[in-house]
């Protein structure tokens, strides 16, 4: 019988790598929470029509990449390829627009696209996204970008660049679309196969082709900025001014278009120079027509999504690692000590300390080796002699300094020991399996 393994394009995320994922999610949760952004959780599968109407039937995502199937009720369902459409569906279904003001939502979870697996790109992948629904104010665009930047900076990521563009409104794009088709049609035979296919279906996507020959042709194409209405220009200028006031550097990229049809006006990507071809770690923009397109009221909105696999890949390359979270590794040996160690571990956890209890029952030497590998700040050592005296030996794993103290000292003066642990805490590397 063939062995059962994870499917191509999927992967198991195991300790200690899960610590990195938790760090990313917790960092985002804290930063977004301080901005009054609340988490929303939507189903992993939805009606296929949601994505066909929302993302656009002419897009590669809908045309080539969705995991769709018919259930026993003969309904066409799809594993979500992105998070915005489902969030907007929930916004409409639950009448969030009627609550007034701006709905500030974020989400995280797995998404699914049938793509060729490679570093930083899987068929099951994870995104963390932000949606600000109910405002056309340019400040929302700037705030969304600022929050994304703040999260990435808090993770210690470097070598990042913000690319910014405006794709205008529907009228702007319709006029530009025709001008682009008129320009590209004489060169159709020289375009790469994907771009030839897009010439009629989705010509704006040709602008971000990676084919060198196509890029040379596109370099002389008309500029979308020449087709922006006065309102579109004003909004884009306001966004640029606000980013400048916030001290956020950006690069204007007039050929930047996003791969989903719902984008209007502001479009942006945050790119890492350390990721090669899969360089975009965050992308988003404004989507003022999506809510009404899916059956809701006219609702301006802006948002973004981060690819978590790509963030983990950057952390794997050593740019940054999460701080150690384990305070104590507790080793014990002897019938009395082992029973008391379990009680001590629970009391310390109740007091707010992170404690791993060695349950191997092996010799102290082997337990000490595991303590050294655990990432803990200190090792607590409990033998029968210490247990009978109500004491415990404490060893600081970085310095090797040791001391004996009453167990009650750890529990009664927890603030003191928490300060000592914080002072001794160092950022230590976390091993991450290759993606």
UniProtKB/Swiss-Prot annotation:
Subcellular location(s) per record: Cytoplasm
Matching InterPro entries: aa-tRNA-synth_II, aa-tRNA-synth_II/BPL/LPL, Anticodon-bd, Anticodon-bd_dom_sf, His-tRNA-ligase, HisRS-like_core, HisRS/HisZ, HisRS_anticodon
Name of protein: Histidine--tRNA ligase
GO molecular function, one term: histidine-tRNA ligase activity
SUPFAM superfamilies assigned to the protein according to its UniProt record, in alphabetical order: Class II aaRS ABD-related (SSF52954), Class II aaRS and biotin synthetases (SSF55681)
A GO CC annotation given for this chain: cytoplasm
Keyword flag ATP-binding: yes
UniProt-listed NCBIfam families: hisS
Gene Ontology biological-process entries: histidyl-tRNA aminoacylation
Subunit structure, as described in the record: Homodimer.
Keywords assigned: Aminoacyl-tRNA synthetase, ATP-binding, Cytoplasm, Ligase, Nucleotide-binding, Protein biosynthesis
Catalytic activity: tRNA(His) + L-histidine + ATP = L-histidyl-tRNA(His) + AMP + diphosphate + H(+)
Domain of life: Bacteria
Chief place where the protein resides: cytoplasm
Family the entry assigns: Belongs to the class-II aminoacyl-tRNA synthetase family.
């Amino acid at each position: 019988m063939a062995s059962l393994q994870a499917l191509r394009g999927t992967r198991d995320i195991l300790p200690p790598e899960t610590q990195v994922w938790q760090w990313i999610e917790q960092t985002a949760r804290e930063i977004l929470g301080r901005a009054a952004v609340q988490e929303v959780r939507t189903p992993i599968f939805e009606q296929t029509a949601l994505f066909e109407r929302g993302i656009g039937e002419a897009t590669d995502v809908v045309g080539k990449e969705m995991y769709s199937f018919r259930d026993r009720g003969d309904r066409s369902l799809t594993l979500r390829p992105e998070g915005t459409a489902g969030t907007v569906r929930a916004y409409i279904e639950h009448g969030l627009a009627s609550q007034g003001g701006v709905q500030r939502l974020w989400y995280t979870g797995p998404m699914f696209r049938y793509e060729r697996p490679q570093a930083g790109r899987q068929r099951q992948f994870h995104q963390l996204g932000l949606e600000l629904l109910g405002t056309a104010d340019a400040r929302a665009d700037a705030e969304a970008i600022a929050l994304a930047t703040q999260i990435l900076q808090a993770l210690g990521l470097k070598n990042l660049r913000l690319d910014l563009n405006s794709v205008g409104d529907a009228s702007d794009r319709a006029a530009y679309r025709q001008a682009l088709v008129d320009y590209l049609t004489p060169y159709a035979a020289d375009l790469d196969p994907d771009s030839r296919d897009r010439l009629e279906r989705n010509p704006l996507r040709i602008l971000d082709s990676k084919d060198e020959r196509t890029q040379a042709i596109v370099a002389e194409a008309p500029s979308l900025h020449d087709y922006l209405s006065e309102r579109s220009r004003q909004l884009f200028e306001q966004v640029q001014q606000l980013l400048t006031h916030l001290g956020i550097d950006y690069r204007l990229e007039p050929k930047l278009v996003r791969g989903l049809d719902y984008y209007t006006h502001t479009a942006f990507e945050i790119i890492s120079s350390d990721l090669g071809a899969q360089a975009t770690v965050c992308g988003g923009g404004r989507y003022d027509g999506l809510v009404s397109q899916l059956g809701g009221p006219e609702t301006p909105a802006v948002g973004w999504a981060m690819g978590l696999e790509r963030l983990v890949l950057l952390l794997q390359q050593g740019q940054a690692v999460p701080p150690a979270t384990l305070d104590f590794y507790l080793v014990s040996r002897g019938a009395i000590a082992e029973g008391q160690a379990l009680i001590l571990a629970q009391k310390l956890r109740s007091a707010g300390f992170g404690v791993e209890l060695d349950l191997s029952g092996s010799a102290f030497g082997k337990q000490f080796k595991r303590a050294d590998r655990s990432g803990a700040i200190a090792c607590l050592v409990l033998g029968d002699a210490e247990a009978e005296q109500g004491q415990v030996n404490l060893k600081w794993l970085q310095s090797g300094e040791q001391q004996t103290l009453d167990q009650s000292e750890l529990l009664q003066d927890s603030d003191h020991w928490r300060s000592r642990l914080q002072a001794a805490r160092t950022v230590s590397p976390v091993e991450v399996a290759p993606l």
